[in-house]
Amino acid sequence: MARHNHHFHCLRIAFALGFVLTAGSIQAQTPDMRIRKKLIATGWDHPDTQRLLENLAEMEKRPFDGVVLEATGVTAEGKSCSLRPAFSNQRWQREWFQASVDQLRACKFTRFTDNFISLGANPGNVDWFDDEGWEEIVEHWRIAAWVAKQSGCKGLLFDPEPYAKPHAQFSYAAQPGREQHSFSEYADKARQRGRQVMKVIVEEYPTITLFCYFMNSISATATGRADPRLALAAQGYGLYPAMIDGWLDVVPPTVVLVDGCESAYRYNSRQQFLESALRIKGVCQELVSPENRAKYRAQVQASFGMYLDAYWNPKESPWYIDGLGGPRVERLRVNTTAALAAADEYVWVYGEKYRWWPTPRKNVRPESWNEAMPGCEQALCYARAPLDFARTELANARQAGNLVSLVRNGDFSLMEARSIDGAEQKWRDGGPPAGWSAWQGKDSKGSFTWDQEAGVTGKGAAKASRVAEGCFLQSFHVAAGERYAVRASCSVHGRGSAWLRVRWQTSAGQWTAEPQDRVFYGEASADNWRELLGVVEVPEQAGRLSILLGVAGQAAPEDVVWFDDVELYRLGEPLEKSSP
């Protein structure tokens, strides 16, 4: 057992942690501390408030936590007025948008918890020094924040991209007064406008989330120099960091800002998402005034955009994600999973050619994304909520009668079972159940046995008693990239705690990939049996998966943990191949 020393030294940390986390008194007092990661749908098929109301039940079947939507008002003359072109000098009235508010209030949401009203930087034809024009732009932001607040939306989705050329709100080169004012003068004015905008936003909606397709991530190349303005002056979004700085001047701590990092459209590795998150959290602070950097660190979230078309487009397209030897839709799953792991809260999914739900847009094809790219919804479902995905897949397999666990003697009913290499192993009196081994720390004097009369249904269970720190173990041959659902039942009597841990070994049996260990704790239940359930993915260097049924904190013979119905299932074969 010498080769296990480092591994079990690490386990001791988990044993102590497990005892704290599963103590009943703490469970009774602690709120749900998990950070829920969310997928937000946007793209050419985004709904307006009326279509959302009409199609909500169908839309909430898709794997999203919210949508970007358009609010359209009606003027006194009966003309439509969208909130999106907010950077204009047109005068708006908030009552024009009351119908949109009413339609959103009428929606009975069951899944879409985080919806965002779309707002854009177009037409962008108002000079930053135009006080009268900016009075209207600021009022547009106020109205948009009012619509979001009154309708129960999470906040606003701001798209800074210019679509009304030659105008470009954040480009110094596009400003009408560039011959009269230097870049620094324009930047100072943009910061002032940012303060004005944020002030009215929080007056209407003090707890708003301002979700941007991108913030300073678009200007990251300007960092690393004493004066970023020298580089920003030549960039298409060079004035945008100044406006963001203005937001930060007056933003209260109740507001969340999201850098959506649209540049992630072509990311195709976990490392790219992690490095981008570090840039947003790290060097992008250099584009913020020193006095605002604490606010930036506390209130700006990292997010990422997933461009669905890049997983469908032909290879010659500049917007193309390679399958790296496998189905491209599998890369969608892998990359969305990586994006959610690196993001603070949100990942947004953007599509153009196809649709998730009905849309009148003529430039969106009639086929759904599921039809155009089979397996894409399954990929997003898994990335968003692996446990929910596993429960559904296992339930379907169980109903079909083809659910077979890979665990040997997982129900603890057998006198003999095979080892990982197929050798017969018979149970020995006083030892762990057949097919299982056990380990405990050198100062632990407990017992690991087979209780033939215990268990969920009384057919047998693994029993650990008076164990200070230890575990039952069983290992399996696996391959990198495979995904598994693992579950067990446990019952704790007296002092102590229990959990299920998945560890990794090389094909030669050496422990590896320790940061990718996974530990699963059960929730208390009425019948004293709690379920331990989790989903894992085999890391590159691993050839074996090890299930550890961990126990700690026992001191007396009456301190007992029983484990039963340990199961391991491989989740789905690789997703179907996508078009071209």
Question: Locations of the language-model features?
Answer:
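Bacterial N-terminal signal peptides
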Residues: 12-23
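Sec/Tat signal peptide C-region and signal peptidase I cleavage site
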Residues: 25-27
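N-terminal secretory signal peptides that target proteins for export/translocation
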Residues: 1-10
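Extracellular and organelle-lumenal recognition/adhesion modules and their flexible linkers in secreted
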Residues: 397-580
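Glycan-processing catalytic domains of CAZymes
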Residues: 29-400
